[in-house]
């Protein structure tokens, strides 16, 4: 019989127990996020724009101090992000955006946003910043200007739809084709909307 160093015997996992494992939804948005991070690295390395992902704030609960110079965090939790996912600068203009993903085939749920995020976006727009959402939905990627998101958000708050229908999103947003380098070239749309001659 095989035993661990602590004396307990080895118990192999059975096929039945591995089949009962519940699916994990913890990294649903990682593909979109990874593609955006690669895109932003491309923009920065080619001196196009400087856009960074904001770190998720962490609430530290318990710290051990075995030595004065060696503090060890024993317990910490991710806090709710207070603003948007990404910010930076492009052609002298402040850029601020959120990245969202849904598996729904019919609509984009507005519950993906929080009041404080919408309020932050409104403040950015009021200061003439470029603010938008990159949405991965219906096997497509969309660029939705913050001002258009505000319409859907206000409709929801007036006891209206709690989501953006597929046809509404396709009409209000700008599609972004996936590329190789950069992967999600959202700067093209920013150029069309904010920097092309009228």
Curated annotation (Swiss-Prot):
Q: Could you tell me the keywords of this UniProt record?
A: Cytoplasm, DNA damage, DNA recombination, DNA repair, Endonuclease, Hydrolase, Magnesium, Metal-binding, Nuclease
Q: List the residue ranges of the region (Disordered).
A: 1-29
| Gene Ontology molecular function: any one | nucleic acid binding
Q: Which domain of life is it from?
A: Bacteria
Q: Which reaction does it catalyse?
A: Endonucleolytic cleavage at a junction such as a reciprocal single-stranded crossover between two homologous DNA duplexes (Holliday junction)
Sorted alphabetically, which InterPro entries does this protein's record hold? Answer: Resolv_RecU, Restrct_endonuc-II-like, tRNA_endonuc-like_dom_sf
Q: Which GO terms describe its biological process?
A: chromosome segregation; DNA recombination; DNA repair
Q: Reply yes or no: does the keyword Metal-binding apply.
A: yes
Cofactor(s) recorded for this entry are: Mg(2+)
**EC number, as in UniProt:** 3.1.21.10
The main enzyme category here is hydrolase
Q: Which family does it belong to?
A: Belongs to the RecU family.
Q: What NCBIfam families does the record tag this protein with?
A: PRK02234.1-2 (NF002581), PRK02234.1-5 (NF002584), recU (TIGR00648)
Query: What HAMAP family does the entry give?
Result: RecU
**Function in brief:** Endonuclease that resolves Holliday junction intermediates in genetic recombination. Cleaves mobile four-strand junctions by introducing symmetrical nicks in paired strands. Promotes annealing of linear ssDNA with homologous dsDNA. Required for DNA repair, homologous recombination and chromosome segregation.
What is the name of the protein in this document?
A: Holliday junction resolvase RecU
């Amino acid at each position: 019989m095989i035993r661990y160093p602590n004396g307990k015997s080895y118990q192999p996992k059975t096929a039945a127990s591995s089949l009962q494992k519940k699916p994990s939804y913890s990294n649903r948005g990682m593909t979109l996020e990874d593609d955006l991070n690669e895109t932003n690295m491309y923009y920065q390395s080619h001196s196009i724009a400087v856009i960074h992902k904001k770190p998720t704030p962490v609430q530290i609960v318990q710290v051990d101090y075995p030595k004065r110079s060696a503090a060890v965090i024993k317990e910490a939790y991710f806090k709710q992000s207070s603003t948007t996912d990404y910010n930076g600068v492009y052609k002298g203009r402040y850029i601020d955006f959120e990245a969202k993903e849904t598996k729904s085939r019919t609509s984009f749920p507005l519950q993906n946003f929080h009041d404080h995020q919408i309020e932050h976006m409104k403040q950015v727009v009021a200061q003439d910043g470029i603010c938008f959402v990159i949405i991965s939905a219906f096997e497509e990627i969309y660029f939705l200007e913050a001002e258009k998101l505000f319409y859907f958000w206000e409709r929801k708050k007036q006891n209206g739809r709690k989501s953006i229908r597929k046809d509404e999103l396709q009409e209000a947003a700008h599609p972004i084709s996936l590329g190789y380098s950069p992967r999600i070239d959202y700067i093209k749309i920013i150029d069309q909307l904010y920097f092309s001659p009228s």
